[in-house]
Amino acid sequence: MKLTLEGLKNKQDWEAAGIALPSYDIKKVAENTKKAPAWVHFGAGNIFRIFIGGLADTLLEKGEADKGITCVETFDFDVVDKIYKPYDNLVLAVTLKADGSTDKKVLGSLTEAIKAQSNVPEEWNRLKEIFVNPALQMISFTITEKGYALKGADGAFFPFIQADIDNGPEKAGSAMAVVCALLNERYKAEKAPLAVVSMDNCSHNGEKLQNSILTMAKEWLAKGFVEEGFVEYLSDEKQVSFPWSMIDKITPRPADSVCEDLEKAGVEDIAPVITSKRTYIAPFVNAEGPQYLVIEDKFPNGRPALEKAGVYLTDRDTVNKVERMKVTTCLNPLHTALAVYGCVLGYTLIADEMKDEQLNKLVHQIGPVEGMPVVTDPGILSPADFVDEVINVRIPNPFMPDTPQRIATDTSQKVGIRYGETIKSYVAQYGDAKKLTAIPLAIAGWCRYLLGVDDEGNAFERSADPMLEELTKALAGIEVGNPASYNGQLKSILSNVNIFGIDLYEAGIGERIENMFLEEIAGPGAVRATLKKYMA
């Protein structure tokens, strides 16, 4: 059985293997979409394929849509050549359930895959053709937060962005320049309206995307590449809207165990590949079942019936509240605590950590106990139910191959939101954050993790982080097993408002974190002993 249009003709084989196939005519959907695309998506990776592609598939199955999604890859063009084209743009979606069973379905909703290459006329002209079509209703994005960044920490444009500014729309290279150039084509054609929707997992994502597109447009205006009217078009939300959204579905890299099961079931050529850009991707995508997408309902040219596929459509304030609930209380703070302690305690699977008595207690304390008193309640979702599902269904799912090492990536960029916001809320409500124990313990655990030595005294490789070098320098001289080597090195980190959003000493917990950290560097087994002490 091959995952191709030809291969799907053997319906009985797929059904016998327990793999559901689309009931709609995949070729017809592709033809409809090609003629008049309604939805274009930038960032053709895993969460897009299973979640967003799955939404479109649901609408097609229900007869609520007759078009799919046009996929555009902006970063790793190998994905198009190795994962889309050889498989006729089909995806095998595998939902991993906590009881060990899986739901498997082929999605036929991704109708075309294009590379965002302005230097390849065939690709570039096709994108222009799509963008000038008035039928286009929305473009969406999962390109990660980094994909929107135009400037480095020094406030200067990245060199590749400066090159895009200098070279103009016809030679766009970065995702933001490509999108801005294509929006300019739409403006020049007939100024048709459009919704530009970030679906990346970062707060105020619509605002980030809007700022980046507008910055690029204004830089081009200053150089004479675009008209003043183009900037006005982008600035008018009745013409071009930038709705905010909140997305949530844990989508780990393709698991070997899933690949083996599919091969045993008779599916051929399904193994993951590693692209030249180091993307680990396969013809199948595996993910958890629970999923949430909340979008600000601001679509000036109409939209697909997303609510029929389980998407929450609401106002901006509610989107913001849902996002804040998730990232500051109900999911992300728990994940980060498990990530840093998991690495130090030698875990390689997040789910296994939930069987660890102290770590289980830690996440119960961080979310339901310490987070809930100051949680943001969005109204459309219950924070208590959400965190209950996270702790009892989502994180303990043993078939989710998610690792503490993956989640520990870029922690310096996350602790301000994941812990700093709750700490600030405690200061606002109680005058200080001294009531907190589990959150300071999580922060102490991150500092201990930064030493790159596990609880048995062995070195381990820390995950990538833009501040890793700076943080390593700040902690210089500290030796595990020699508490006397600590001379206040944590102070510059814990007082750094750029990291935590607040000076933790002013919040009343800086010294407490230092003391916990000191206990954790006492020697082999000290991290476990410290967790036992505070999470008894």
Q: Where do the PLM segments sit?
A:
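Substrate/ligand-engaging "lid" and interaction regions
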Residues: M1-F42, N46-A536
